[in-house]
Amino acid sequence: ITGVSAENFEVLFVSLVTTPSGFITIIPDYTGIGDPDKYHPYIIADPHTEAVVNMIRGVKELAIELEDSNDRFQFNDQLFLIGYSDGGYATLASQRGMQLDYPDEFSITASFPMAGPYDLSGTMVPYFLSEPEYSQPYYVPYVLTSHLWYYQGVDVDFGEYFEPFWAD
């Protein structure tokens, strides 16, 4: 748990509920969340999937390394994925990525993606365009800047997308 997530009640709550029940709980630190100098690729599948896959692999390696020590823990064949909001999106993206790209490495027992923005082009965009006012005015620019940075690089000219006051 990073310094950022250690102060997050939801992160601590999930850890406190699942770990004493015998589950190995892995909470990935997505790109840009624990490091303010990096942008977070919000609702972009590949970086989320990569973070989850690498975290699971790392914990599996640690289990093997600690096999003969007093700190050992045991993996079984069950893999549960769960997430809420951006984590819900990450859960569904990771499930899809694991099933398509790593079918021999990961077998998912159950997946619980909750309250994530799953269907941007089919649901979210038409909704945003139909509303005269959106209650969370930061959200659309957050999604847009995330996608621009990820797909076009950090030298994006935001003046092409926003009024000059907001582009600066």
Predicted regions and their residues:
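Short, surface-exposed "cap/lid" segments of acyl-processing enzymes
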Residues: 1-22, 35-36
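Alpha-helix capping and helix-loop boundary segments enriched in small/acidic/polar residues
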Residues: 2-9, 39-47, 82-86
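Extracytoplasmic/secreted envelope proteins and their assembly/folding machinery
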Residues: 15, 49, 53-56, 91-95
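Short beta-to-alpha linker loops that shape the active-site pocket of alpha/beta-hydrolase fold enzymes
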Residues: 29-33
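Alpha/beta-hydrolase active-site loop
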Residues: 42-67
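Primarily recognizes the serine-hydrolase "nucleophile elbow" in alpha/beta-hydrolase
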Residues: 58-134
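Accessory cap/linker subdomain of secreted extracellular hydrolases
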Residues: 114-168
